UniProtKB/Swiss-Prot annotation:
Organism (species): Ectopseudomonas mendocina (strain ymp) (Pseudomonas mendocina)
Organism taxonomic ancestry: Bacteria, Pseudomonadati, Pseudomonadota, Gammaproteobacteria, Pseudomonadales
Stored HAMAP family: PdxA
Pathway entry: Cofactor biosynthesis; pyridoxine 5'-phosphate biosynthesis; pyridoxine 5'-phosphate from D-erythrose 4-phosphate: step 4/5
Protein name per the record: 4-hydroxythreonine-4-phosphate dehydrogenase
Co-factor note (free text): Binds 1 divalent metal cation per subunit. Can use ions such as Zn(2+), Mg(2+) or Co(2+).
């Protein structure tokens, strides 16, 4: 790991637990320079509320750190709030602040200031209440980086699950499983497992759409007409794709033992298993971006903000994964050079 590579951390919704997570994390030293892109005033006030003695070290374009902060301290690129934020109380006036932190982090990753960005949860509803159309981090960063197609992947120790479709009603899923979509998603998953995770020849298990993967066409024909022919074309490109497999048996130790990732057809086919296996220690990764972005797998938890009664496990895993991805990417760049 290059201990001089800087990483950006965005705390998300200022009334949620994101600022708390940043401060609690700062109690221990990180192996790299980690920069919170946040309001200094917000972090100072929340630290006082939590009873934490964290030294906030202001940094920015004029002076970036090139070594990790000591335990009990946190680098902060000050990004002012529009109005004061209070734990647990949403205010649409600060929607612009949230998006500014994401923009600074994303642009910093594009221009090389940061090796990766790690995001704490935002509150989509309050941003939309401010009159700003916002459907989530993923779509915002895709637009910021001019990326046409991105893929959502959640991961925990020992399991990665990517999705062909994401937040769709179940009744719309089958129509959305097209050969074109499946090809795009699989290619992105395969390419990023190689480029950002350092896996030379990824082994990907692919779920069927229907029960028993269609039971030879008796329980649905999508496997026969769309999924299998598409996988055959992709195998001809050199991809190691296993499936389509019945989802109820795919997620067993025997199948997963040598798998680098699972490709699920829809949200609730793959994510319940992952969250059962690693809830509180799982993360979200956006694949297909020209930058590295990882995130926690939970929400803003407004009721817990300022209480100190929160678990940093998901954020810690998101950080560790970002560090590993940056190291893999840096290693490939150096080899190419």
């Amino acid at each position: 790991m290059n201990t001089q590579q800087r990483f950006a951390l965005t705390p998300g919704e200022p009334a949620g637990i994101g600022p708390d997570l940043c401060l609690l994390l700062a109690r221990e030293a990180q192996p790299v320079p980690l920069v919170a892109i946040a309001s200094l005033a917000l972090l100072a006030e929340r630290a006082q509320q939590l009873g934490l003695a964290i030294e906030l070290l202001e940094v920015g374009p004029e002076q970036w750190p090139d070594s990790p902060a000591a335990a009990g301290s946190l680098y902060v690129w000050d990004t002012p709030l529009a109005v004061p934020a209070h734990a647990g109380r949403l205010d649409p006036a600060n929607a612009g602040y949230v998006l500014e932190t994401l923009t600074r982090a994303g642009q910093g990753c594009l221009d090389g200031t940061f090796a990766a960005m790690i995001t704490a949860p935002v509150h989509k509803g309050v941003i939309n209440e401010a009159g700003i159309a916002f459907s989530g981090h993923t779509e915002f960063l895709a637009e910021l980086t001019a990326t046409e197609q991105v893929v959502m992947m959640l991961a925990t120790r020992g399991l990665r699950v990517a999705l062909v479709t994401t937040h769709l009603p179940l009744k719309d899923v089958a129509a959305a499983i097209t050969a074109e979509r499946l090809q795009r998603v699989t290619r992105i998953l395969h390419a990023d497992l190689q480029a950002k995770f350092g896996i030379a020849a990824p082994r990907i298990l692919v779920c069927g759409l229907n029960p028993h993967a269609g039971e030879g066409g008796h329980l649905g024909r999508e496997e026969i007409e769309i999924i299998e022919p598409t996988l055959e074309r992709l195998r001809a490109e050199g991809m190691n794709l296993i499936g389509p497999l019945p989802a109820d048996t795919l997620f067993t130790p025997k199948h997963l033992e040598h798998a680098d990732a699972v490709l699920a057809m829809y949200h609730d086919q793959g994510l319940p298993v992952l969250k059962f296996k690693g809830f509180g220690a799982a993360l979200n990764v956006t694949l297909g971006l020209p930058i590295i972005r990882t995130s926690v797998d939970h929400g803003t938890a407004l009721d817990l903000a300022g209480s100190g009664n929160i678990d940093t496990g998901s954020l810690q895993v998101a950080l560790e994964t970002a560090y590993q991805m940056a190291a893999a990417t840096s290693g490939k760049s150096q080899a190419a050079g």
